[in-house]
């Protein structure tokens, strides 16, 4: 398979300058030891981080088909470590210590290692200071990729030690076109996928996942049923939503267990513990991503309801559930739809603060039900 068709970097067609810059850096052997990807949410920074990790670990600069490339694309490579803040206030000191303890260890499968640090603006002074020396002079074959919204909200000492890569904001129309080209699906459906999943690459993955699409359908049905729902109905819907969101994790867990089994005979106890910790982080990150995707489904739905209340001919994102949008619009008013959107935003903040997902969704559904009935 040709690299242009298979590599993750080649698929970053909504960020051409970033794609070309990173491709040339890896191919020329001049890749930096530390990058800081800067841009608004939805610009594709995380997609680019995984793409760069794939190219860096591949012995052919990201062929897309070797064992390393396939594992990185599936987010199951033991030498790519993904970190996200584990507390409401940001990164824990324990997370930084774990990362620093891991850096000197030899790679498990590849000849190098990559550390992706998401929401790096949440690296505060007490957690970042220990990381500074390693960022400045990491061991050979180690790459750090930090993701943030703006250099202005980052610690200057972090910014100065990284090569900054700006990402432009991609319009929804351009993103939908990219997904449509990649999948051959209807542009309207692709627009919905980007709105729910957050970026073109994740939109493509969303359209390939029956489980993720089912979670979205269940969220739409849950909100559609709230007008007539009693408390037991709401709690039941919330429970079903959590089950649906976790459904895609079964395949991830199965793959992780197979990798552990394959490596059990020749890896040291420390290396196995390292792999188990990485698997746990990956599952937690995937679950959080699934919850946020479900909440994005709720947000786009209620946005469409609000737009419809203001203009019946409004251009909505969720074309395939216009009946639900119409029923909700008929049952409430602008104030109610606005309060419902605020309930979704509160749930998103609660998840970011590590509130239990089921509790966050239960509270959101009850608040939306109350908001819809305000007329």
Give, region by region, the residue ranges found by the protein language model:
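Clamp-loader machinery-focused feature within the broader ASCE/P-loop NTPase space
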Residues: 1-126, 130-136
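Charged, glycine-rich active-site and insertion segments that engage polyanionic ligands
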Residues: 1-54, 68-71, 140-142, 149-297, ...
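Walker B beta-strand of ABC/ABC-like P-loop ATPase nucleotide-binding domains
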Residues: 116, 145-146
């Amino acid at each position: 398979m040709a690299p242009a068709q298979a590599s993750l970097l080649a698929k970053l067609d909504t960020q051409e300058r970033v794609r070309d810059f990173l491709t040339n850096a890896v191919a020329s052997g001049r890749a930096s030891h530390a990058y800081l990807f800067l841009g608004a949410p939805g610009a594709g920074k995380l997609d680019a981080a995984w793409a760069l990790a794939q190219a860096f670990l591949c012995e052919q600069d990201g062929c897309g088909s070797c064992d390393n490339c396939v594992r990185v694309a599936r987010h199951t490579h033991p030498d790519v470590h993904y970190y996200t803040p584990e507390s409401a206030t940001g990164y824990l000191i324990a997370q930084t210590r774990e990362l620093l303890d891991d850096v000197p260890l030899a790679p498990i499968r590849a000849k190098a290692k990559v550390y992706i640090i998401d929401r790096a603006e949440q690296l505060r002074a007490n957690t970042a200071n220990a990381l500074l020396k390693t960022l400045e002079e990491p061991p050979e074959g180690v790459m750090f990729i930090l993701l943030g919204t703006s250099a202005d909200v980052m610690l200057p000492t972090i910014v100065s030690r990284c090569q900054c890569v700006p990402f432009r904001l991609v319009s929804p129309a351009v993103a939908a076109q990219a997904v449509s080209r990649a999948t051959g699906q209807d542009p309207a459906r692709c627009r919905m996928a980007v709105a729910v999943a957050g970026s073109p690459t994740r939109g493509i993955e969303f359209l390939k996942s029956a489980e993720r699409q089912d979670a979205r359908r269940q969220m739409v049905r849950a909100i559609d049923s709230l007008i007539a729902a009693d408390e037991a109905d709401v709690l039941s819907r919330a429970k079903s939503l959590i089950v649906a969101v976790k459904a895609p994790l079964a395949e991830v867990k199965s793959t992780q267990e197979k990798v552990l089994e394959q490596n059990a005979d020749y890896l040291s106890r420390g290396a196995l513990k390292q792999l188990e910790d990485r698997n746990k982080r990956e599952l937690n990150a995937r679950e959080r991503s699934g919850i946020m995707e479900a909440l994005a489904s709720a947000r786009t739905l209620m946005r469409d309801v609000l737009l419809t209340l203001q203009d019946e001919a409004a251009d909505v994102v969720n074309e395939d559930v216009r009946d639900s949008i119409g029923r909700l619009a008929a049952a409430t008013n602008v104030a109610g739809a606005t309060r419902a959107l605020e309930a979704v935003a509160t749930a998103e903040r609660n998840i970011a603060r590590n509130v239990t997902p089921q509790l966050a969704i239960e509270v959101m559904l009850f608040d939306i039900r109350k908001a819809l009935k305000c007329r």
